[in-house]
């Protein structure tokens, strides 16, 4: 890890790949959730790249029994 790298658990946003590892949810499932919830407050589109707001997505997951 480079000195300028921010640990994944401190990042504000995560890529689909990072979120998949962090939340232990498949990449395809996360892409599908993003596609189905385009206006969700936990989602940011950076061009065509999906970014997930970590803390807000954690709150969503806390309320769910299953994904």
UniProtKB/Swiss-Prot annotation:
This is Excisionase from transposon Tn916. The keyword Iron does not apply. One of its GO terms (biological process) is DNA recombination. Pfam families: Tn916-Xis (PF09035). It comes from the Bacteria. Keywords: DNA integration, DNA recombination, Transposable element, Viral genome excision. The gene is xis. InterPro entries: Tn1545/Tn916_Xis, Tn916-Xis.
């Amino acid at each position: 890890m480079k000195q300028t790298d921010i640990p994944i658990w401190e990042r504000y946003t995560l890529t689909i790949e990072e979120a998949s590892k962090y939340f232990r949810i498949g990449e395809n499932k996360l892409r599908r959730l993003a596609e189905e919830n385009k206006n969700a407050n936990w989602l940011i589109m950076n061009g065509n790249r999906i970014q997930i707001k970590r803390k807000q997505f954690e709150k969503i997951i806390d309320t769910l029994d299953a994904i």
